[in-house]
Regions:
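Flexible helix-coil transition and linker loops at the boundaries of alpha-helical arrays
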Residues: 55-69, 98-102, 132-142, 176-187, ...
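TPR alpha-solenoid repeat register
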Residues: 74, 109, 142-143, 188, ...
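Structural detector for short beta-strands of small beta-barrel domains
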Residues: 318-337
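OB-fold (S1/OB) nucleic-acid-binding surfaces
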Residues: 331-359
Length: 427
């Protein structure tokens, strides 16, 4: 397509606008599915295709520019072609604005105008465009963009009446509606996965069910062959696995994302995970036995609620241990580069060393020397092999503040974390 010559002025009839439409669709197909290792190659190819599409548009004969609907369509196509690049384009906005004035029923023009205005930071006006588009009837593309915009709005908090969580809940709602309009459309499922992933962070990175819902949506997205080459899908799927502590799956997906689009930083995410695993593995193995004995003897007693019975780590089953409480001492706070979770090395009364991962609490909430009680502990044995490295340790995961007592007390409101993830504007 990039090598096509500009059409000649002799091209007349209804085919002229149809050919511009076809060229514009090809332009956006390349934008959304072409991911070379060098981003400059993509920019160059898109620019060539955009020039070809504009040349086709300029060649549309005068007789195909007479009615308001024809002029609206041509203004829309020109604005859409100019808006294909990531940065805001004033000329694109002008053409798209003319299109919706000439034909207020042109849904695609409202959608593109909203995307264009979003790029210059006017999120409220962008939302108005999407809302006007939806007033013409349900539309999966508009619903997806509205869902993305609501996530973006939740990060900058520009609407005082709507708090962050409400906006993200609306984002999930609109993403679901888009997916239900076409259950085979991978992009809609991908958008829903992103909405759940953002929701996990907005609600304090403490509800792993949101991560699981995110992965289910991504799995549905992958059923669409058009999504197989999307590096953002691989990267976001890897992110969900990372926070579910499915380390090997996360490593494989980040590596896949890095091979598809190096600019996303998948290689750096792999490095971070390996670094964390090394720290966790070595911390379990390197603590001196003398220190272990001293800490274990100083555990003391914590009175448990009747619903719980005391247990040690070695007696736990894989998964959630309902009705069980583990008393342990914090030996070491383990620093790392990610926003969550909080990692600590603990020891129980049997001198069993294990890693505690805590989601939803501020980093300073648990300190070395603290005595913690883990209620209904979610236990697993981590065993990861990756390119010659092998890490193995016992892990208890805490997703909610109500699952942990620190020195016999529930975490205070000040100790509960609130993290966030920025939504990317990707049409």
């Amino acid at each position: 397509m990039s090598g096509e010559e500009a059409p000649q002025a002799s091209e007349t009839g209804d085919n002229a606008i149809a050919m511009v439409t076809e060229a514009t669709e090809e332009l956006y197909r390349v934008r959304d599915t072409y991911f070379p290792r060098d981003p400059a190659d993509k920019t160059s190819r898109i620019r060539t295709l955009a020039d070809t599409a504009l040349a086709r548009l300029d060649s549309v004969p005068v007789e195909q520019r007479k009615s308001a609907q024809q002029r609206a369509m041509l203004e829309f196509l020109k604005g859409k072609i100019l808006d294909v690049f990531p940065d805001y384009n004033k000329e694109a906005e002008d053409h798209l604005s003319k299109a919706v004035k000439l034909n207020p029923s042109l849904v695609d023009a409202w959608l593109c105008l909203g995307n264009c205005i979003w790029k210059k930071g006017d999120l409220v006006s962008a939302k108005n465009c999407f809302t006007l588009a939806l007033s013409k009837g349900p539309n999966k593309k508009v619903l997806c963009q509205l869902s993305m915009l609501e996530r973006s709005m939740s990060q900058v908090n520009i609407i005082g009446q709507e708090d962050q969580a409400t906006l993200v809940d609306e984002s999930i709602k609109h993403a679901k509606e888009a997916a239900m309009l076409d259950i085979k459309d991978g992009n809609s499922w991908y958008n829903l996965g992103n909405a759940y992933l953002t929701s996990f962070f907005v609600y304090g990175a403490c509800e792993h069910t949101k991560l699981q819902n995110s992965l289910k949506a991504y799995q549905n997205a992958e059923k669409d062959e058009l999504m197989n080459s999307n590096p953002d899908l691989s990267f976001n799927c890897a992110t969900a696995h990372k926070y579910l502590e499915n380390y090997e799956r996360a490593l494989h997906r980040f590596e896949a994302a890095a091979s598809q689009d190096p600019s996303l930083g998948g290689d750096e995410e792999v490095r971070k995970i390996i670094s964390v695993l090394d720290k966790l593995d070595s911390s379990v193995k390197k603590v001196r036995n003398k220190k272990l004995t001293s800490m274990a003897l100083n555990l003391g007693e914590i009175s448990l609620e009747p619903a719980y019975r005391g247990a040690t780590v070695d007696s736990l089953s894989e998964g959630i241990n309902t009705g069980v409480a583990v008393l342990a001492k914090v030996l070491l706070f383990i620093k790392h580069d990610n926003i969550a979770p909080l990692y600590c090395l603990l020891i129980d009364s049997n001198m069993c060393r294990f890693i505690l991962s805590v989601f939803g609490l501020q980093f300073e909430s648990v300190k070395e020397g603290d005595c913690v009680t883990l209620l209904a502990p979610n236990y697993r044995e981590v065993d990861v092999s990756w390119k010659g490295k092998h890490c193995q340790f016992k892990l208890i995961r805490v997703d909610f503040a109500k699952q942990i007592l620190i020195n016999g007390r529930r975490p205070s409101l000040r100790q509960i974390a609130c993290t966030s993830m920025i939504s990317q504007n990707k049409s």
